[in-house]
Curated annotation (Swiss-Prot):
Keyword terms, alphabetized: Acetylation, Activator, Cardiomyopathy, Chromatin regulator, Cytoplasm, Deafness, Developmental protein, Disease variant, DNA damage, DNA repair, Hydrolase, Isopeptide bond, Magnesium, Metal-binding, Non-syndromic deafness, Nucleus, Phosphoprotein, Protein phosphatase, Transcription, Transcription regulation, Ubl conjugation
GO MF annotation terms: metal ion binding; protein tyrosine phosphatase activity
Active site: 375 (nucleophile), 377 (proton donor)
Family, as annotated: Belongs to the HAD-like hydrolase superfamily. EYA family.
Cofactor: Mg(2+)
Main location, first listed in the record: cytoplasm
Enzyme class: hydrolase
Protein name per UniProt: Protein phosphatase EYA4
Catalytic activity: O-phospho-L-tyrosyl-[protein] + H2O = L-tyrosyl-[protein] + phosphate
Length: 639
């Protein structure tokens, strides 16, 4: 090995008599023009009249990094140059001689046997820490009179772009055109060192030193055709036709694939390219064998996806059986599939009794953030305290007048419930929610159905089929029960904002008069409550839910007569008469989930304890000031 180094050093030190260059010793290294024209080199100090450079100038810039020095300059072989790159020094490098070594082990490249080699696998790039270097000498035996085609030159540097931090790559630019080179000697090639490790910095044409990013280390290294994998090389060898390779304009573009002319793919002599560091630089490789998210396993048969460096324009059969191929047929289940499976398993499992169906819940992508759970009596409306006279005593009103107004409203509530909402039929068959018996409904058209003659009330009275314990009758009777609740739901949705149309003209006037008198007696209690309800209703991420101890049908009549239908959809009304408010809160949490915030608004102890058990904030309503404070908090978006 040492003998080979000496022979190359002696060969490089021979003079070149046909050279004439300008003085450029004091400029920074990375001016590649002298490399592009190796036959126009400076002569040695012993060649008379061959150069304007003096012997003293050459010797003043020479430095030895391995303990050996020449008379005029230091000749570094590849190993010495590697050591100098790793050693920070203020000295300058005078010359770099690229040396060819005999084939050995796994560090050499196998040539194709052609006499002319069109690519140069190395790259002559200096470190950013070196001072200006002197001119170079090359042996005329090593370099014929024709220029070497693939040494980086000024035209090539103009198309380069600093790679560090760059996200877009111009991979379709044409390489610079060079004069054809016919080499007669042995082709020059660096040993297969990792150029990204050897070269710490790249100096561009403008003179700015670009620090090499980690993505550059182990970048693509192209050589005339490897027969065996190289050291540090993954077993993925991409065999591609020459037409499918588009040269990039990055830092390795000109010394890797540029030819003497703008050649087509058929003129390329070296179709085999190997890639280093595949596990770290995924952006260089086509992901064709890795199927898209949850697709079938025939993805490799289609057109592979392109990468930032090169494009594979046709499928590569050799990649379909790589060790890292992803088998999508045995892929793990996705979150969407798991959600669907859980939904199928849990559907109906939480239903209480035979006829109850799960309440409609918001879709998975719902933006619901807050649920306001309201009590009805003495919170939104003043009703029970009017009947007992407690409201009149507390606020100094006329007790007989208050009781009279309460009785008139109670009569109107039950009249509406009996006349239009089948309360006579459903009083003994009360439900917690309007959809609890919808599973028994067969969807029959009710436009011509006669509820008075279907025999539902007689069967229920004689056989006592509907008991508070939840015992139910036969299938036919349950279907008739479901018909009635469906009809109630239709009437509610039709007249929730126009209860006067349901009452008729005569009763409508009486209802409006009664409402005005109650508002006057209660100092606009309902009006203040409606302000807060309307604010919540206008929010897209909030919802109102009503939980009352009144039976479901009378509760619906109250909501209609107090003009609350616009604030409470019928699906959001629950009756706690049979199961209590705590159980109603549990059903509401099961419906809307535990990620939303629940705010309970009421006046009684029962809803306060239920809210405390489920860690829900509780807003107590005991006077007008509490309603006004709630409205202000909602206006300021504290709630």
């Amino acid at each position: 090995m040492e003998d080979s180094q000496d022979l190359n050093e002696q060969s490089v030190k021979k003079t070149c008599t046909e050279s004439d260059v300008s003085q450029s010793q004091n400029s920074r290294s990375m001016e590649m023009q002298d490399l592009a024209s190796p036959h126009t080199l400076v002569g040695g100090g012993d060649t008379p009249g061959s150069s304007k450079l003096e012997k003293s100038n050459l010797s003043s810039t020479s430095v030895t990094t391995n303990g050996t020095g020449g008379e005029n300059m230091t000749v570094l072989n590849t190993a010495d140059w590697l050591l100098s790159c790793n050693t920070p020094s203020s000295a300058t490098m005078s010359l770099l001689a690229v040396k060819t070594e005999p084939l050995n082990s796994s560090e050499t490249t196998a040539t194709t046997g052609d006499g002319a080699l069109d690519t140069f696998t190395g790259s002559v790039i200096t470190s950013s820490g070196y001072s200006p270097r002197s001119a170079h000498q090359y042996s005329p035996q090593l370099y014929p009179s024709k220029p070497y085609p693939h040494i980086l030159s000024t035209p090539a540097a103009q198309t380069m772009s600093a790679y560090a931090g760059q996200t877009q790559y111009s991979g379709m630019q044409q390489p610079a055109v060079y004069t054809a080179y016919s080499q007669t000697g042995q082709p020059y090639s660096l040993p297969t060192y990792d150029l990204g490790v050897m070269l710490p910095a790249i100096k561009t044409e403008s003179g700015l030193s670009q620090t090499q990013s980690p993505l550059q280390s182990g970048c693509l290294s192209y050589s005339p055709g490897f027969s065996t994998p190289q050291p540090g090389q993954t077993p993925y060898s991409y065999q591609m036709p020459g037409s499918s390779f588009a040269p990039s304009s990055t830092i390795y573009a000109n010394n890797s694939v540029s030819n003497s002319t703008n050649f087509s793919g058929s003129q390329q002599d070296y179709p085999s390219y190997t890639a280093f560091g595949q596990n770290q630089y995924a952006q260089y490789y086509s992901a064709s064998t890795y199927g898209a998210y949850m697709t079938s396993n025939n993805t490799a048969d289609g057109t592979p996806s392109s990468t930032s460096t090169y494009q594979l324009q046709e499928s590569l059969p050799g990649l379909t059986n790589q060790p890292g191929e992803f088998d999508t047929m045995q892929s793990p289940s996705t979150p969407i599939k798991d959600l669907d499976e859980r939904t199928c398993r849990s559907s109906g499992s939480k239903s209480r009794g035979r006829g109850r169906k799960n309440n409609p819940s918001p879709p998975p992508d719902s933006d619901l953030e807050r649920v306001f759970v309201w009590d009805l009596d003495e919170t939104i409306i003043v009703f029970h305290s009017l009947l007992t006279g407690s409201y009149a005593q507390k606020y100094g009103k006329d007790p007989p007048m208050a009781v009279t107004l309460g009785l008139r409203m109670e009569e109107m509530i039950f009249n509406l419930a009996d006349t239009h909402l089948f309360f006579n039929d459903l009083e003994e068959c009360d439900q917690v929610h309007i959809d609890d018996v919808s599973s028994d409904d067969n969807g029959q058209d009710l436009s011509t159905y006669s509820f008075a003659t279907d025999g539902f009330h007689a069967a229920a009275s004689s056989a006592n089929l509907c008991l508070p314990t939840g015992v139910r009758g036969g299938v036919d009777w349950m279907r008739k029960l479901a018909f009635r609740y469906r009809r109630v739901k239709e009437l509610y949705n039709t007249y929730k904002n126009n209860v006067g149309g349901l009452l008729g003209p005569a009763k409508r006037d009486a209802w409006l008069q009664l409402r005005a008198e109650i508002e006057g007696l209660t100092d606009s209690w309902l009006t203040n409550a409606l302000k807060s309800l309307s604010i919540i209703s206008t929010r897209s991420n909030c919802i109102n839910v009503l939980v009352t101890t009144t039976q479901l049908i009378p509760a619906l009549a109250k909501v209609l007569l107090y003009s609350l239908g616009g604030a409470f959809p019928i699906e959001n009304i629950y009756s706690a008469t049979k199961i209590g408010k705590e159980s109603c809160f549990e059903r509401i949490m099961q419906r809307f989930g535990r990620k939303v915030v629940y705010v309970v608004i009421g006046d009684g102890v029962e809803e306060e304890q239920a809210a405390k058990k489920h860690n829900m904030p509780f807003w107590r309503i005991s006077s007008h000031s509490d309603l006004l404070a709630l409205h202000q908090a909602l206006e300021l978006e504290y709630l």
